[in-house]
Curated annotation (Swiss-Prot):
CDD domains on file: AdoMet_MTases
PANTHER family tied to this protein: ELECTRON TRANSFER FLAVOPROTEIN BETA SUBUNIT LYSINE METHYLTRANSFERASE
One GO-annotated biological process of the protein: methylation
Domain of life: Bacteria
Broadest EC class assigned to this enzyme: transferase
Protein's recorded name: Ribosomal protein L11 methyltransferase
GO cellular component, one term: cytoplasm
Family per record: Belongs to the methyltransferase superfamily. PrmA family.
Keyword Membrane part of the UniProt annotation: no
């Protein structure tokens, strides 16, 4: 079955291109993407061979593209993206932009995406290595092999690296773990590498399920040793509680999920959240305290925050 990908592409012009490239990128990142394609007006290939190959061309526009699974939520996602950018830029006279959407077969673009991804040391211990890159493991490093596809990055975005930093500081030995909104499966893989016993991953998207399965296998993790469940949390998890909950999702969704997460916690459970923009941190903490959690640690990277909670 071919997977489909939705590309959201913004072409923009401004006298301050760097400023708006960052703003556009941060908005896309706030929607949960972990990899972007950024194009600027430069020669796309070797300039020495430009006249020898008529297929070569100049990139003539500034653009930022984000990639999402194409599914039943895509039309809503388009609308929300349009509204978000319109609200941000409607009264800003310093930028002119156009947002368009395109649909592709995932496998048609798999190879072209690979050139944008590299080996990344994302925390003190964890190294994330795309399968097509060579890397010599150093002492004490924990290497995650990833073939993320065009719709996922490799863990270098602050939201993922912050959560991996929190994870490597915990004792996962034989613990039961659930990753809510697993995406590429990177946090499930990290949990297993850190010695977890039972590892569950949930997501509402079939595309994510397939990508996560492939990445688990790449890391020599048998699908019999984990559970991947498609659906909303309490619909797929019944009468099960976990030692550790990890979740890298937008703050607004985290706030809503906490009303469900409270039912899957043990007395001494810990909860590790990321995906929280600085302005939303207090809202997430307040809701977490309402459901019986207390803050142990907050990690920061630029405007992003990750939080370590435990049961009170």
């Amino acid at each position: 079955m071919k997977m489909k990908v939705l590309e959201a592409k913004i072409i923009y012009e401004s006298d301050d291109l760097e400023k708006y490239k960052k703003i556009i990128s941060d908005i896309f990142y706030s929607f949960g993407v972990t990899g972007l394609k950024i194009e600027e007006p430069i020669l796309n290939k070797d300039p020495l061979n430009f006249y020898k190959d008529e297929k070569q061309f100049l990139i003539s526009e500034n653009s930022v593209s984000a990639y999402f699974p194409l599914n039943i939520y895509s039309e809503k996602r388009k609308k929300v993206l349009e509204e978000t950018f319109a609200e941000k830029f409607s009264e800003d006279e310093d930028i002119v932009y156009n947002l368009d959407f395109y649909e592709y077969d995932e496998e048609d673009y798999q190879n072209s995406w690979k050139k944008y991804l590299f080996v990344e040391k994302v925390s003190e211990k964890f190294v994330v290595k795309p399968t097509w890159r060579e890397y010599e493991k150093q002492d004490n490093e924990l290497v995650i092999e990833l073939d993320p596809g065009r719709a996922f990055g490799t863990g270098s975005h602050p939201t993922t690296s912050l959560l991996l930093k929190l994870m490597e500081e915990q004792d996962f030995s034989n613990k039961s773990v659930i990753d809510i909104g697993t995406g590429s499966g990177i946090l499930m893989i990290a949990g297993k590498i850190l010695g977890a016993g039972e590892v569950y991953g949930t997501d509402i998207d079939e595309f994510s399920m397939e990508v996560a399965k492939e990445n688990l296998i790449l890391n020599n993790i048998s699908l019999n040793d984990v559970k991947l469940l498609k659906g909303n949390l309490l619909e797929v998890i019944e009468n099960k509680k976990f030692d550790i909950v990890v979740c890298n999702i937008l703050a607004d969704i985290l706030v809503k999920l906490l009303d469900e997460i409270k039912y899957i916690l043990k007395e001494n459970s810990i909860v590790l959240f990321s995906g929280i923009i600085e302005d939303k941190l207090n809202e997430v903490i307040s809701k977490a305290e309402d459901v019986g959690l207390e803050v142990v640690e907050v990690k920061a990277d630029k405007e992003w925050r990750a939080v370590y909670f435990k049961r009170k």
